[in-house]
């Protein structure tokens, strides 16, 4: 599972998820992509489950790029702990995803295979997603 090797601070504030993704919202590497339509925290476990689902489906052919990285620690208190006595310990890592963000990209496979692989990956994620094709993106920009 993905997590940072080291961070400057162990704990982070939760923050807000307003607005759209401007960075990471264009197809850069592959021919097909999965784009987020809702804001959410996506855990490293969900990213790994999606990656496994895609790699199992496309087998040897093709290449997959993961365009998000879980760099935010989420802390939790132990069960049945009284209020106070500080912030809990980091339990897992999440990637902050805003609408428009490209989550995964695939190249080297047909559109049907890519579409099905992305569908399997999308099942593992807690958000609505959209399948994007490079040729359609180029046509819209012209």
UniProtKB/Swiss-Prot annotation:
Origin: domain of life: Bacteria
Disulphide connectivity of cysteines: none
GO cellular component, one term: cytosolic large ribosomal subunit
InterPro entries: Ribosomal_uL16, Ribosomal_uL16_bact-type, Ribosomal_uL16_CS, Ribosomal_uL16_dom, Ribosomal_uL16_sf
Keywords: Ribonucleoprotein, Ribosomal protein, RNA-binding, rRNA-binding, tRNA-binding
Oligomeric form and interacting partners: Part of the 50S ribosomal subunit.
Name listed for the protein in its UniProt record: Large ribosomal subunit protein uL16
Source organism (scientific name): Nostoc sp. (strain PCC 7120 / SAG 25.82 / UTEX 2576)
């Amino acid at each position: 599972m993905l997590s940072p090797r080291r961070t400057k601070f162990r704990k982070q504030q939760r923050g807000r998820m307003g607005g759209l993704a401007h960075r990471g919202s264009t197809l850069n590497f592959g021919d097909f992509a999965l784009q987020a339509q809702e804001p959410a925290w996506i855990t490293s476990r969900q990213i790994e489950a999606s990656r496994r689902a895609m790699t199992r489906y496309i087998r040897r052919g093709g290449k997959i790029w993961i365009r998000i990285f879980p760099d935010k620690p989420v802390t939790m208190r132990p069960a049945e702990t009284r209020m106070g006595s500080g912030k809990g310990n980091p339990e897992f890592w999440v990637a902050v995803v805003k609408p428009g963000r490209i989550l995964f990209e695939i190249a080297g496979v047909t559109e049907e295979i890519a579409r099905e692989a992305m569908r399997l990956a999308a099942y593992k994620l807690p958000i609505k997603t959209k399948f994007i094709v490079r040729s359609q993106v180029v046509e819209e920009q012209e």
